[in-house]
Regions:
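Short aromatic-glycine-(Arg/Gly/Cys) micro-motifs in beta-strand/loop hairpins
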Residues: 1-17
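Generic alpha-helical hydrophobic packing signal
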Residues: 4, 25, 30-31, 55-56, ...
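Ordered hydrophobic segments in well-structured contexts
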Residues: 4-8, 21, 46-48
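Generic alpha-helical structural signal
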Residues: 11, 28-29, 51
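A short, exposed loop/beta-hairpin motif centered on an aromatic-Gly-Thr core
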Residues: 15-29
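A short, charged, amphipathic alpha-helix used as a generic interaction element across diverse proteins
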Residues: 25-46
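Short, mixed-charge low-complexity intrinsically disordered segments
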Residues: 39-62
Length: 62
């Protein structure tokens, strides 16, 4: 079953945060996606992935 995860992408203090809703089976698949996004976009400094229960979350940053 696909769970709903919210990705918060922080590009820095001056630019507002961007929220994306994604569906995945496991949070680890989204962590890999977040790491790829960090490599491709130098403006992104932190990506927070919040799970549907708010108990499972992961932060990917440089």
């Amino acid at each position: 079953m696909l769970k709903r995860y919210e990705l918060t992408i922080n590009r820095g203090r001056k630019v507002p945060q961007e929220h994306k809703i994604m569906r995945a089976v496991q949070i680890s698949s989204l962590v890999g996606l977040a790491e790829d996004m960090l490599e491709q976009d130098d403006d992104i400094c932190t990506i927070t992935i919040m799970g549907p229960t708010y108990k499972e979350y992961e932060v990917v940053s440089r």
